[in-house]
Amino acid sequence: MPSSMSGYIPSYLDKDELCVVCGDKATGYHYRCITCEGCKGFFRRTIQKNLHPSYSCKYEGKCVIDKVTRNQCQECRFKKCIAVGMATDLVLDDNKRLAKRKLIEENREKRRKDEIQKSLVQKPEPTQEEWELIQVVTEAHVATNAQGSHWKQKRKFLPEDIGQAPIVNAPEGGKVDLEAFSQFTKIITPAITRVVDFAKKLPMFCELPCEDQIILLKGCCMEIMSLRAAVRYDPESETLTLNGEMAVTRGQLKNGGLGVVSDAIFDLGVSLSSFSLDDTEVALLQAVLLMSSDRPGLASVERIEKCQEGFLLAFEHYINYRKHNIAHFWPKLLMKVTDLRMIGACHASRFLHMKVECPTELFPPLFLEVFED
C-alpha cells in the first residue's frame, strides 16, 4: 500500500504516528495496536482464513519488516504483528462480523428513534387554558359550517351547461357568465351570514368596538369563505362545494365571476387535500384570519394582535398534539394563511371589475355591504 495513502485519521493519533509493524503512516488502533491499513488487513485475513500455518520464511525467520519489505515475507510480517501485541482474539469471523455490524446498525437506529422521540417530547401541547380556547373556536366553526361532515351527501352539482357560455366580457381576459353568477349570488348571502355568526360566537371578537368588528369581518369574509370551500375539494369530481351545498368545477367558478381567483381557490383546495385538516384546525385557521391586526382603519390594533397571538400559540400546540406525518407541517400550514390573504386581496380587485361588468340588481345587498369600501 502506498505510503501517501489518505483517509480518515482519528483525532487521538499524533499527526505523524507510524505503524508499529512496518513503519508506514498509521491510521488508528487496530486489534490493540497502532497500525496502518495494510497491516490491519493482512493480520485480519491471516486469522480469518487461518493462513499462518502455510506461511514460510526463506531466510530462517530473520527478515526486517518495513513498508518496502512487508509484502516479501508473510511469516516474518505475521510474527512481528504478534510480537508488537496485535490480538488474534479480536479478529471476528464472518458470522461475528455480520452480527457486530447488525448490532451497530440497530444501535444507530435506536439512537435515531430516541432523538425523534425526544424532539416530540420537547414540543409542547395545549395547556388547559388553550384547550378551553380551542373548544370555543371549534364549536363556533361546527355550529356555522353548512352541512358539517355530511357535505358530500348533501351537495348538488351545478349543471354542466351553466358556466360554459360566457356572455359578458370582463377585463383581464376573464369572462362572466351571468347565469352562473346569479346561481352563486343565491348562496353568497347565507355563506357570508355564517362567517359573521362564526365571529360572533367568539367572546374576544364580541368585546371589540363595533367599528373594529366591521373592519375585521369585511377583511376576512372572502378569506374564510374560500377556506371553507377549499377544504371541501373533491379530487374525484375535481369540484369545490360552496356553502356546503353547491359543487362547482374550476371553469364554472371562473366564468361565474371569480376569474383568476377561482384558480387560486382550487389550487389551495388541491394542496390542502393532503393535509387532512380536522374541524379544529380549520376553525383555528379562521380565527387567525379573523383576528388580523393589519386591516386598515382598526383602532384596537394591540388588543387584536394579542388575540391572534393567543390563537396562533394554541394552534401550534394543537398541531403538536395531532402529530401529523407531514414534515414541517406547522410552517407549511401557516403559509396557507398567506395564500388566503392573497385570495382576499385578489377578490377585492376582481369585485371592482364585477361591479362594472354585471347588472347591479344581481348583487345581493349583504354582498355589496361586505365587499364595497
Curated annotation (Swiss-Prot):
Inducing factors: By thyroid hormone.
**Record GO biological process:** cell differentiation; negative regulation of DNA-templated transcription; negative regulation of transcription by RNA polymerase II; positive regulation of DNA-templated transcription; positive regulation of transcription by RNA polymerase II; retinoic acid receptor signaling pathway; thyroid hormone receptor signaling pathway
Q: Name one Pfam family in it.
A: Hormone_recep
- Where in this protein does the record put region Modulating? 1-18
Q: Its function?
A: High affinity receptor for triiodothyronine (T3).
| Family of the protein in this entry | Belongs to the nuclear hormone receptor family. NR1 subfamily.
Q: Under which name does UniProt file this protein?
A: Thyroid hormone receptor beta-A
Q: Which organism is it from?
A: Xenopus laevis
